[in-house]
């Protein structure tokens, strides 16, 4: 921007496909299938809200996000934008949990979570009964405390 500040959200709109929407999160969660995924999604919404105190926002078509931070990709500093601090998606095959391993403290605690697999940017869980909800709450709190990534560009 002309004043030397950066409009991160505008930059993310141009580069990221997963952006906040005005879609109704409750409607989205109640439409999840199968029924087990719907129940787990509703329970996750309760847990995430309880820990963060934030209202959920649907990011893209399927990610329930809480809060946001400004990210800068470590692989390509030109890739930047806004992203939820933490969140989840009740996908048909499994639950996707976001932000839980982004910070060193969370990554160190992750093995205590229970039965899960890892993706590049998320943790996959088959069902909530497979994990320790107290550990999940701690992981959410760690993710929630995250700040913005530093902007590597010199300020004007």
Residue ranges of each PLM-predicted region?
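Charge-dense, helix-prone N-terminal extensions
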Residues: 1-156
């Amino acid at each position: 921007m002309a004043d030397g500040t950066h409009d991160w959200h505008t930059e993310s709109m141009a580069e990221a496909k997963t952006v906040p929407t005005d879609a109704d999160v409750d409607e989205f969660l109640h439409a999840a299938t199968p029924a087990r995924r719907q129940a787990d999604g509703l329970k996750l919404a309760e847990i995430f809200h309880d820990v963060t105190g934030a209202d959920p926002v649907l990011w893209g078509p399927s990610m329930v996000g809480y809060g946001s931070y400004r990210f800068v990709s470590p692989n390509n500093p030109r890739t930047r934008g806004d992203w939820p601090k933490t969140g989840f998606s009740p996908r048909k095959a499994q639950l996707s949990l976001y932000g839980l391993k982004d910070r060193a403290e969370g990554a160190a605690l992750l093995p205590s979570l229970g039965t899960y697999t890892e993706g590049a940017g998320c943790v996959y869980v088959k069902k909530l009964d497979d994990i320790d909800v107290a550990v999940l709450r701690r992981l959410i709190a760690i993710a929630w405390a995250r700040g913005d990534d530093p902007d590597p560009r010199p300020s004007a």
